[in-house]
């Protein structure tokens, strides 16, 4: 939040506070509240001073050598380029010593499998930053799902001007190899904290603090809007709001054919949130404790409780993974399939879906295991048939 001179201590370090009303408890004085203005010159000078103190204490004769060794690993061309598939292309974002801000690029499957891919560079972020005089940090791409048979062409690219939480979202045409001009209706959202998601080819769902839209006391987006081409954020239809003292709002659309759903999330705090799905123009909150993490995929709703969760007399321990039919659960059904239960030796690190299978990344006695679960077949140790993927190193 922005502060004024009256909000932070004077040069002597003393802060003033209004006298409390009779009988009222005095308001606590936060002597560091002035640092909330993170772009203020006085605040940045203070940060530089603290950095200098730290460097003086930590930088010894071995520091430069250690830094060079770390950078050699981070900049190594032997790293595996991680990719994401969109249509027939495999996309990668690559940073190294020559490209510190990164290259957004793509290649074909045969080229990628050959071991020395021929990369088609779509965007050089270093060149963009130099051309626009802004220290852009690339925060990812969100593709519009095209009509069947059409290529993935349009994407929202997120750029932070300083590496922080606030992003500017700009529409990019990968076939034209450039940003879609706002004068021609291209989306170009001003920098703000929040998120943006495609609803359709001409509409975005946006939660943001830009253009003075409401924000929470945590300085994140409080409102979700439906933004159509040609509209400003202030003209957009408001579709979701949360209390000011909650952390942040998110709105997003799942465009999976046959399973299209629009979601809104009220992040109450860092560890608690309520998730709602849009039904017939109304938000329907999914009935789970606020500390149960939710995710959906096609027919399924997955649950990851952060604390023990008792449902229909059965207690599921924290760290479990459970599943239910999406529509059945919304209709009141509470028949949960147990997909994973932690034990003293095993924890669930992450999971991901293919079209038909669920992959669990387990850590057993500090060794990774990948389990492939099939929702179509009953299992023995879990509700769904599971096999261990033994082809992983």
Give each language-model segment a name.
Residues 1-29:
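Charged, compositionally biased N-terminal leader segments and the immediate start
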Residues 27-61, 67-89, 93-110, 115-121, ...:
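Peripheral, non-catalytic segments that deliver or gate enzyme domains
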